[in-house]
Amino acid sequence: LDSIKNKIKEYKLQDNVNLVGTVNENQKNYIFSNTDLMIMPTLDESSAKSIEGFGIAYIEAANFKIPSIASNIGGTPEAVIHNKTGLIIKDIDELDEAIKSLIDNKENRLKLGQNAKIRAENQLNWDIQIKKYNDLIKEIE
């Protein structure tokens, strides 16, 4: 987190970047309504037997047409598809490059956000996921 805060200061982005913790539903909707880019990198904690799950926050952002920058860890590559609904990064240097590229290329940022929303609506909504699980359970029975 300190390295991210340092990059924010280095590029003088304090007025444009907010690192937020836990928020309620109304706060979340307000934040997403005023957000251009979801940045949620994850550390590899596999040695501690802690793996990032699917990443519901990426889908919540997608519902607001917000593309995401995510790490290639755990289930996040299933939530964010590289160069289609956002960008997948390997390390802090790629995070820096990904942020710059989506800030500088508004057209691509908007395209990724639109793709993310379409995917969230058509493939990742709760009704579709519940049906998939029900079908799987019926198949096993």
Where are these regions (language model features)?
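Short alpha-helical donor nucleotide-sugar binding micro-motif in glycosyltransferases
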Residues: T22-V23, Y30-T35
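Short acidic active-site motifs
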Residues: N26-Q27, E94
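Short acidic/histidine- and often glycine-rich active-site loop of Leloir-type glycosyltransferases
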Residues: K49, A70-N83, L87-I89
